Regions:
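Juxtamembrane cytosolic amphipathic helices that cap and anchor the N-termini
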Residues: 2-13, 98, 207-221
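Extracellular/periplasmic helix-loop-helix junction of adjacent transmembrane segments
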Residues: 28-61
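Conserved MFS/SLC helix-loop-helix module at the cytosolic interface between two early adjacent transmembrane helices
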Residues: 61-100
Length: 221
């Protein structure tokens, strides 16, 4: 008989994944160091800020591309893929000595990684807790929010000791390993037949969510 995965371990892995992804939002720490390092090239805040804006925009794109396949393929592969993209984007930013490269690595690649991993990890956590969906969703969201608060100071310390570009490389490798390792325990949740006690309102499809104005309002907030 196949052993049922520990759902609390899966929830912990999802929280750790989202906390790691939250490093992408420690942009203020990274941007200051980038501007100081590339002052001779004439980089200004308006230019470097575009990298973060692109990353922010690519997150829902990643959700649109990968989200509809999570239920059929399973969350593990998309969290793993997200970890590869996120870590690679962060690591490659360590070589971004021009703005176009910065936009590609930190903007496009890293942003798509967040979209793939965050959507899958949050989804699997809530599906393993049909009786505590609010708790699971709240904890995974909190993990993401705590990411920049926890990793930001670490990044600042690394920047002071080794510089911004080496910091990107170190964080890229470490966070890739953390996210990809966490993905290994994210088994697909079993289908639970609804009863009078556990029946849940039918969820929306990704297309329906994207047509919902409330979704975009919450995302912008």
């Amino acid at each position: 008989m196949k052993k049922t995965p520990n759902r609390w371990l899966i929830l912990a892995a999802a929280i750790l994944t989202n906390l790691s992804l939250g490093a992408g939002y420690a942009w203020s720490v990274f941007q200051k160091a980038l501007l100081e390092t590339n002052a001779s090239q004439g980089w200004v805040q308006a230019q470097t800020s575009l990298a973060f804006s692109i990353s922010f925009a690519m997150v829902p794109v990643g959700m649109i591309l990968f989200g509809p396949k999570v239920d059929s393929v399973g969350p593990k592969k998309f969290v793993f893929l997200g970890g590869i993209l996120f870590g690679t984007g962060m690591f490659a930013t360590g070589f971004a000595n021009s703005l176009p490269v910065l936009y590609l690595t930190y903007g496009v690649v890293l942003g798509l990684g967040i979209g793939s991993a965050y959507g899958a990890s949050t989804s699997v956590a809530t599906k393993w807790f049909p009786d505590k969906k609010g708790l699971a969703g709240g904890l995974t969201a909190a993990g993401f929010g705590l990411g920049p608060l926890i990793i930001g100071p670490v990044a600042k310390s690394l920047i002071a000791s080794m510089g911004i570009y080496s910091t990107f490389k170190v964080l890229g490798i470490v966070l890739l390993l953390v996210i990809c390792t966490s993905s290994l325990v994210m088994a697909k949740a079993p289908t639970v037949a609804p009863t009078a006690g556990n029946a849940q309102p039918e969820g929306k499809t990704y297309k329906e969510v994207l047509r919902d104005g409330n979704y975009w309002l919450l995302w912008l907030i």
